[in-house]
Regions:
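Extracellular ligand-binding interfaces
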Residues: 1-95, 103-117
């Protein structure tokens, strides 16, 4: 994707799920994996948000399970369990409609968003 930037309380990245014509597959979100976001900005000054208009939590902010540095950038990981806890269900293929990465109080540049195992 290259990189995407945003300032406080705006989305740097918004990806629709495949059931809505987008490129992210909700059925990829499985136990044992996590969302991985690589970015520049203040430490942990971003949010992973799972959005649903199909019966899941409408705007679920997922807690960060790990953060650090890699490839000259910062990263966060949000575990499967944290995703289920925030979203209220494990039915990501049926109820997840969009994934967002949002800046909190500062500016961020996002380089990568993926679900890893």
């Amino acid at each position: 994707w290259g990189s995407k930037s945003s300032s406080n309380w705006n989305q740097a990245v918004s990806v629709m799920t495949s059931k809505n014509g987008g490129s992210f597959y909700g059925n990829d979100v499985k136990k044992g994996g996590c969302f991985y976001v690589e970015y520049d900005g203040n430490k942990d000054d971003l949010e992973l948000i799972l959005q649903s208009w199909s019966g899941g939590a409408s705007w679920a902010k997922v807690s960060i399970s790990e953060s650090g540095s890699a490839n000259g950038h910062r990263y966060i990981k949000c575990s499967y369990d944290n995703c289920v806890s925030a979203f209220g269900t494990s039915d990501f293929s049926g109820k997840l409609d969009q994934v967002h990465v949002s800046a909190k109080s500062g500016n961020i540049t996002v380089y990568s968003v993926c679900y890893i195992y």
